[in-house]
Curated annotation (Swiss-Prot):
GO terms for biological process: nucleotide-excision repair; SOS response. Its main location: cytoplasm. It comes from Neisseria meningitidis serogroup A / serotype 4A (strain DSM 15465 / Z2491). The UvrABC repair system catalyzes the recognition and processing of DNA lesions. UvrC both incises the 5' and 3' sides of the lesion. The N-terminal half is responsible for the 3' incision and the C-terminal half is responsible for the 5' incision. It is found in: Cytoplasm. GO terms for cellular component: cytoplasm; excinuclease repair complex. Belongs to the UvrC family. This is UvrABC system protein C. Residues 209-244 form the UVR domain. Residues 22-100 form the GIY-YIG domain. Interacts with UvrB in an incision complex. InterPro entries: GIY-YIG_endonuc, GIY-YIG_endonuc_sf, GIY-YIG_UvrC_Cho, Hlx-hairpin-Hlx_DNA-bd_motif, RuvA_2-like, UVR_dom, UVR_dom_sf, UvrABC_protein_C. GO terms for molecular function: DNA binding; excinuclease ABC activity. Keywords: Cytoplasm, DNA damage, DNA excision, DNA repair, Excision nuclease, SOS response.
Length: 617
């Protein structure tokens, strides 16, 4: 792999194009400020990159991008497939403005069976680690939790954390309601529990017929040995499996060994693009999800380009199914890259018959319905913005970005300020910020509000003065009454800001829908009707700000209390405190530990274990 760079100050695009090699690779376009505009891959770098500057038939999105190109960087690769993987890595790392981006930064969740002596069944998101078993990925957390509930009913596996499991002396409620076999207190042998784990894994791998035959054999054996309670338990499992099977997709092409299958349906309408993903794992439909890339810079989106971008971003470097059924072609280079990572051949199916054709048709209908719903949502959001703009005396076109602030603490402890952002007709969680309040006295909400507003907008002024691009809000919402909004006005005067301010107070009766709006620059204080679209928008942003502030405050408070509880114990410094928390999984586990358990922690003597135990009890 070889990278070619040239100093941006002396960059000559025609000369650069003349010297480009006719080799596969990745190219990156930058603007005058050095910000990456676009990343692409090519079989022939010279032909591909030169085409941007020699042709005039580009889409509006690409034409707008080309006008801003100041300099170019390229990286030569050994093949188009290698270039595709590198391109995808660059796109994920740099988020270029003019690339097609399917914004779903979180990793997908899995169902995990841990490598513990008595494996835990759990929801998992993150890097896959041995010796745990993972099943998925699932489209969303609800799909994982639904599967866990099913497995609890049939196989009764534990879901508690290891730190809790190791310190129980009696069964929990899940045992009482027949959702767990209580391995924590020895109500099931290790061999029998592992047999249940194997059965659950067999079910998750889609081998339901094989599992049913195994359970039937065990039921008959138990009955022959006059073990009627055990035989009844196997009978109940078989019945539960039958009910679940009737509600699942089963791939009749290979019913005894179902494959992992993904369905991808592309739909394009009225400038919107949707890719609908359906996940089938082990013959079970575990969920589906609609993805919408940002098309605001592309009034005439090419669906095939977006579909290819989705496949690359969704699968490269991630878990892959054996079969992908889709209503668009997948380029050979992309197939090669995916199969290279997967380690075996994958099937890409566009021509379907029978039930697979029905599945794909359903996915297409869901994609089209998702676009219709998105259009309706956008229309509703625009209506809300229009009404709020009218209230603020602004043009609708001038009101896009709202920022909202809230303060949270418990009697002055662990004060946190939140700033949430509403932009492009939706909340923008990736742009949220929390601020630890450091200068205000505990419990002084006014000083806390002054600190957060001064820090945020003072820093933005400094950044702008240094030539950085800053995204200012079109209006700022303050969760609070006249006192809080008065502080905001004074900060505006100090910083010389002229951004519209809106205060939202709970009103005399503190009921939803009875909020009072405060417009400090006109002196108006009034209520909107409970069905007002503008009020609904303000409530949504305000509630999100409150949620974000209070969750941050609770984390900070709980962390401080854990540290304080152990730090107050003579002989427990930072290293021993960390060793205790790591060993027992948190303060709750330390409190539940016996004196003997505490002694087993490195650095904890018998005398110190006694001191810790007495302090916590």
């Amino acid at each position: 792999m070889n990278t070619e760079n040239r100093s941006p100050e002396q960059f000559d695009i025609p000369l650069f194009l003349k010297n480009l090699p006719k080799l596969p690779g990745v190219y990156r376009f930058f603007d005058e400020g050095g910000k990456v505009l676009y990343v692409g891959k090519a079989v022939n770098l010279k032909r591909r990159v030169s085409g941007y500057f020699q042709k005039n038939d580009h889409s509006p999105r690409i034409a707008l991008m080309v006008k801003q190109v100041h300099h170019i960087e390229t990286t030569i690769t050994r093949s188009e497939a290698e270039a595709l993987i590198l391109e995808n890595n660059f796109i994920k790392a740099l988020s270029p403005k003019y690339n097609i981006l399917f914004r779903d930064d979180k990793s997908y969740p899995y169902l995990m069976l841990s490598g513990h002596q008595y494996p835990q069944m759990a929801y998992y998101r993150g890097t896959l680690k041995k010796p745990n078993q993972y099943f998925g990925p699932y489209p969303n957390s609800n799909a994982v939790r639904d599967s866990i509930q099913i497995l609890q009913k049939v196989f009764m596996l534990r879901t508690c954390e290891d730190s809790v499991f190791e310190h129980r002396d009696r069964p929990c409620l899940l045992y009482q309601i027949k959702r767990c076999t209580a391995p924590c207190v020895g109500h099931i042998s290790e061999e029998d529990y592992r047999d249940s784990v194997r059965q659950a894994a067999t079910f998750l791998n889609g081998k339901t017929d094989e599992l049913t035959r195994t359970l039937q054999h065990k039921m008959q054996t138990a009955a022959a040995n006059l073990q009627f309670e055990e035989a009844a338990r196997y009978r109940d499992q078989i019945q539960a499996l039958g009910i679940m099977q009737s509600n699942q997709f089963i791939d009749s092409k290979n019913p005894n060994n179902p494959n992992d299958i993904d369905l991808l349906a592309l739909a394009v309408s009225d400038g919107l693009v949707c890719v609908h993903w359906v996940s089938i794992r082990g013959g079970r439909h575990v969920g589906d999800k609609s993805f919408f890339p940002d098309t605001k810079n592309d009034p005439e989106p090419n669906g095939q380009d977006y579909a290819e971008a989705f496949v690359a971003q969704h699968y490269l470097g991630k878990s892959k199914p054996d079969i992908i059924i889709n209503n668009f072609p997948v380029p050979d280079a992309l197939k090669e890259a995916l199969e290279g990572e997967h380690g075996k051949q994958m099937q890409f199916v566009t021509k379907t018959i029978g039930e697979r054709k029905v599945w794909l048709k359903m996915a297409e209908q869901n994609a089209q319905m998702a676009i219709a719903q998105r259009r309706l949502q956008q229309s509703n959001q625009q209506h809300r913005i229009d009404e709020l703009a009218k209230i603020l005396g602004m043009d609708s076109d001038g009101l896009n970005r709202l920022e909202c602030f809230d303060i949270s603490h418990t009697q002055g402890e662990a004060t946190i300020a939140s700033c949430v952002v509403y932009d492009e007709q939706n909340i923008q969680p990736s742009q949220y910020r929390r601020y630890n309040i450091t200068t205000a006295k505990p419990g002084d909400d006014y000083a806390a509000m002054r600190e957060v507003l001064t820090r945020r907008y003072g820093k933005m002024q400094e950044a702008e003065a240094n030539g950085e691009t800053v995204k200012w809000p079109d209006a700022v919402l303050i969760d609070g009454g006249k006192g809080q909004i008065g502080i905001a006005v004074s900060v505006w005067e100090e910083l010389g800001l002229h951004i519209p301010l809106v205060g939202i107070a709970k009103g005399p009766e503190r009921k939803a829908g009875m909020e009072e709006l405060i417009l400090p620059f006109t002196g108006e204080v009034f209520r909107l009707p409970p069905n007002s679209p503008a009020l609904h928008l303000l409530q949504t942003v305000r509630d999100e700000s409150h949620r974000f502030a209070i969750t941050g405050h609770r984390k900070k408070r709980d962390k401080a209390r854990v540290t304080s509880s152990l730090s107050d114990i003579p002989g427990v410094g930072s290293k021993r405190r960390q060793a205790l928390l790591t060993r027992f999984g948190g303060l709750r586990g330390v409190i539940a530990a016996s004196r003997e358990d505490l002694e087993k922690v490195e650095g904890i003597s018998k005398a110190l274990a006694e001191t810790i135990y007495e302090h916590l009890h």
